[in-house]
C-alpha cells in the first residue's frame, strides 16, 4: 500500500489488527506523510489512544473512532478521547458520527473503552456457560438474542469479530 496517496486527506481511520506496534508504525508514517491538520483516528477495540498517539507529533489530532461490528447495522460510534485530543478533533469525529447516522458515545481512554469492557465479560460468561454445560452454544445465543434483543448472540458475535481479535481485546 502506497501511503503517499493519503497525504491530502482530512481524516484517516486506521483499522488494522489489534497490535500496538503495528498501529504506532502506521500512525508514525502517516504523521510524516499527511498535512498537519489531518485527523488520525484509530478503530482500535481496546488499545489506549494515548499510546498510539505517541508515535506522532500531533497527539491533539489523534482520536479513537470505534465502529462496532457489524458496522452497517450498529447504530453507534464509540469516540475515545485521549487526554491530548483537542476539542476540534473530538468535535470533528462527533460530527462524522452524526453524518453517518450513528449515535456518538464518548468513552474515556481506558483499555476496552466502554463497549468492550462490558462485551468481553459477556462473551467470557457465555463461553463459561457452554463449558460448564449450563447450555449449548445455540441456547446461549438464542436466549441473548430473544431476551436481550441483541442482533446476534455473544458466541456468534465472538466468531464474527474473530476469536483472535477477541483474545487480544
Task: Give residue ranges: language-model regions.
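Short acidic capping loops at alpha-helix termini that bridge into adjacent secondary structure
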Residues: 8, 36-37, 59-62, 138-139
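N-terminal alpha-helical segment
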Residues: 9, 23, 72-76, 122-123, ...
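A non-catalytic, amphipathic alpha-helix used as a structural packing/dimerization or gating element
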Residues: 22, 88-99, 139-142, 146
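Substrate-binding/catalytic subdomain of NAD(P)-dependent oxidoreductase enzymes
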Residues: 80, 84, 105-169
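Rossmann-like NAD(P)-binding element
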Residues: 1-39, 47-51
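Buried hydrophobic positions in well-ordered alpha/beta secondary-structure cores of metabolic enzymes
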Residues: 12-15, 41, 93, 126, ...
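Rossmann-fold dinucleotide-binding core
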Residues: 39-109, 116-117
